[in-house]
Amino acid sequence: VHKLRAWIRDDDGLPVRPYLMLVVSTEDGKFLSCQPGDTVETALGGNIAKKEPSSETVLNFLKRVMTHPTQMNSSAAGEKLAPSRPKTIKFADTKTAALHLGEKEKWADETACPYVQGCKDALAALGVEECHFAPVPPMFLENIIRGSIEPGMAPENQEYGTQHLPGLMECTDGFTPEFGKSLYAAAAAYVRASPWESLAARRPIQFTYRLVLREDVSMKLTAFGSVVGSKDAGSYGFSVHKTLETAMKAYDLEHTGDGEDEANAMAAGGQTCMFTSVYETPFEDVDNAELYGWEIAASDGDAPPAEENWPLFCKIQFEKGENGEQDTLSLTRPAIIELQCFELMFKGVVELLNGGELKSSGDAVRDAAGPWTVKAQTAAGSEKGETAEVELEISLPALTSDQAGTFL
């Protein structure tokens, strides 16, 4: 029972991620489904559910597969097969698909997959002799689910989007569930602090701290962060630049642009964390946040609680088109050291905002202020939940200086 990385419309027209109920015969490799009936009890909807299926839904589907089976993976897809009853049924779901891989001796006693206990007694009454857990081979997940089934569920006109970027855990060396929890909590606190109410858009904030992620590096790092957009504008986040020069370029483009301020500011490059909807968030990040309990700031208004405020961390490279060619904007995911910078900056900004110290807007927007010293915990590189304390020196540089910082 797998939660697919795709969006479809539910009966109310709202986007939902569907669930696939896929039956595989281990004797002959057939992918089995059923002829859907016209009632819930006869597997109305077939092998796709628009919400997480209950044990009762899965049981109804399995009964229908036994009595009205069809084969999916053949040249005659949808071909009706003779009714049959298996001796053994092994279950897995999205959260348990990788559990105990290569540890077959643990499968029979594992109860983490809810469908084992939820269907066991009813299946026994039908004559199914064994019902227990078994993980899903990674190659099956990648080749069949990811490579074949999910692409077939995407709308024909769907363009490439940020939801198809690789997940942070999947593409960033050193990114652990513990660091994800700390990073997402810091991002959620940043949203709740509403920094755009106290700080002008793209106004550079200087951060200096000593790197603790790598023992072989003891240098101090300086980088420049700034608030991007606002809730009222409908686009909001945080950007990081390596030097004051590029941070100032983004600031000037933001405030002297021709109305396309966000696109203009992006032309200055850098790294950004924009807060977006769950529908635009990489599927792997969404699944990991759900699996490991990463925090998302509550949505505003009538939106579902976890629909908005998802942090999307990207490195931006903007290339201006020449000779009439179209401008291009490429997105990649930051490295662990760069993500740690976001984690620490979020925590530093929130502490100073909550204390009423960090303000820069209006006539005083170009004035220098600080420095302030803030101590923050980082979980970058953590595998067992341990953290390290980092001392941040935070200041508002005067916006007339050509000082540049260094960033690793």
Segments the model singles out, each with a brief description of its role:
Residues 1-408:
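Secondary-structure boundary/capping micro-motif
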